[in-house]
A protein has these predicted regions:
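Glycan-processing catalytic domains of CAZymes
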Residues: 1-212
């Protein structure tokens, strides 16, 4: 991993790298697919991809804002029908669609890619993606099927999410901790709290239930 994004990013120290590698070996030994996204650019991306492949990961590099589709073809691009994570050879994470001025331009840009796995936000503006829109995104441009996943943060709450209550800005509930200085509008969540769990799952209005 790298401590900072960009072409001049410096690697983590050896102790940190070994700790992370030890954690990631556990799912690998259990036969699970492991995905790595490093915030790097330029020639560093190829290094990340090759390093990940050597370690048994599906690894890629990208901008930390996660707001663009790379202007390069996916690594190991293929026409396979991908229905399980163990079949995935490449992936794209795009969580911030602000560069796409219309809903259709956003969906069109995603549908014209050949990634085996797309990880996107449930919402564009203030409306969740519809069943028809998600079905559209489950097809690669080359005709193969792919997996579509929705991002959901468990460790942080955000004031732009539909569960947010305006009163929390002045007085945060006990399960809502300090703001994240690197991401305005985001707050650390005490993820073990039942009140936070109730917002995330278990009712028709809960975030995970909307995804499902």
């Amino acid at each position: 991993g790298y401590e900072e994004d960009g072409e001049k990013a410096e690697r983590n120290d050896a102790e940190t790298d070994e700790f992370l590698a030890a954690m990631l070996r556990k799912p690998l030994l259990a036969g699970k697919q492991v995905f790595i996204l490093d915030y790097v650019k330029g020639k560093k991306i190829r290094h990340v991809q090759e390093w990940g492949a050597a370690e048994g990961y599906i690894a890629d590099g990208g901008d930390r804002l996660l707001d663009v589709i790379p202007d390069r073809r996916p690594m190991n691009e293929n026409t396979n029908n991908v229905t399980q994570l163990k079949q995935v050879k490449n992936f794209l994470v795009l969580l911030n669609p602000e560069h796409y001025k219309t809903r259709e331009s956003y969906l069109k840009a995603l549908s014209e890619t050949n990634y085996d796995l797309l990880i996107v936000d449930l919402y564009y503006d203030d409306r969740p993606l519809s069943r028809e829109e998600t079905e559209r995104l489950k097809h690669k441009a080359n005709g193969g099927r792919r997996i579509l996943l929705s991002y959901m943060s468990v460790g942080e709450a955000a004031d732009y999410r539909p569960y947010w209550q305006s009163a929390w800005t002045a007085e945060r509930p006990h399960w809502l901790a300090e703001p994240n200085p690197e991401w305005p509008g985001s707050y650390k969540a005490r993820y073990w709290s039942k009140e936070w769990h109730d917002l995330l799952y278990g009712s028709p209005d809960a975030y995970l239930d909307k995804i499902m």
